[in-house]
Regions:
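Residue- and microsegment-level detector for short, conserved "hotspots"
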Residues: 98
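An anionic oxygen-ligand recognition environment, strongly enriched in 2H phosphoesterase
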Residues: 95
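N-terminal, polar/charged subdomain of small-to-medium soluble alpha/beta proteins
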Residues: 1-88, 92, 104-150
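Phosphate/pyrophosphate-binding loop motifs in nucleotide- or prenyl diphosphate-using proteins
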Residues: 101
Length: 150
C-alpha cells in the first residue's frame, strides 16, 4: 500500500462538476493499493498517518500530529501510485490492485482512519474521474509505503 500525504490549508474533490468532498486544514491522502495488501498494512498506515508529527507547533516546528491540531482528512484513491516506467515511456499499472481487491481495502482504510482520528474522513469516489484541488501548506508532502515501512 502506498500513500502520498500532503499537508493542506484546504482540499476538495469534484466529480462531474459537483464538489463531492472538501476539507480545511488537514491532510490530503492519495492512496494506492495492490493485490498483496492486507489489514496489517492498513493498521500500520492509518496509525502512522494519525500520529505523524508534520504540523507546526507554536514555535513553528513540525511537532504536532493531525490528532493534535484536530485537522481533517480527505482520502482519494490513486492507482497511478503503482506506475512502473521501466520499459518505454508509457507507464504500466500491472502492480495496481484489481478492483475486486482494492475497493474493500480502500473502504477498510477509510473506516480505520476514522477510528484513528475519532471523526469522519472525507473521500473521493473510487474509480471515478476526479478533479482534486488543494492548497499545499508548507509545502509538506510525504510518501509512504507499507512494504518498506517508510
Amino acid at each position: 500500500m502506498r500513500a502520498v500525504l500532503q499537508r493542506v490549508s484546504r482540499a476538495s474533490v469534484t466529480i462531474d462538476g459537483t464538489v463531492k468532498s472538501k476539507i480545511d486544514e488537514g491532510l490530503l491522502v492519495l492512496l494506492g493499493c495492490e493485490n498483496a495488501d492486507t489489514m496489517e498494512d492498513i493498521t500500520w498506515l492509518t496509525h502512522k498517518i494519525a500520529n505523524l508529527r508534520i504540523f507546526n507547533d507554536e514555535a513553528g516546528v513540525m511537532n504536532k500530529s493531525i490528532l493534535d491540531v484536530g485537522g481533517d482528512i480527505l482520502v482519494v484513491s490513486q492507482f497511478t501510485l503503482w506506475a512502473s516506467y521501466k520499459k518505454g515511456n508509457r507507464p504500466s499499472y500491472l502492480r495496481a490492485g484489481s478492483h475486486e481487491v482494492t475497493v474493500p481495502l480502500y473502504e477498510a482504510f477509510v473506516r480505520e482512519m476514522e477510528q484513528e482520528i475519532g471523526k469522519p474522513v472525507m473521500t473521493g469516489e473510487f474509480g471515478a474521474e476526479m478533479k482534486v484541488e488543494l492548497l499545499n501548506d508548507g509545502p509538506v508532502t510525504i510518501c509512504m509505503d507499507t512494504k518498506n515501512k517508510e
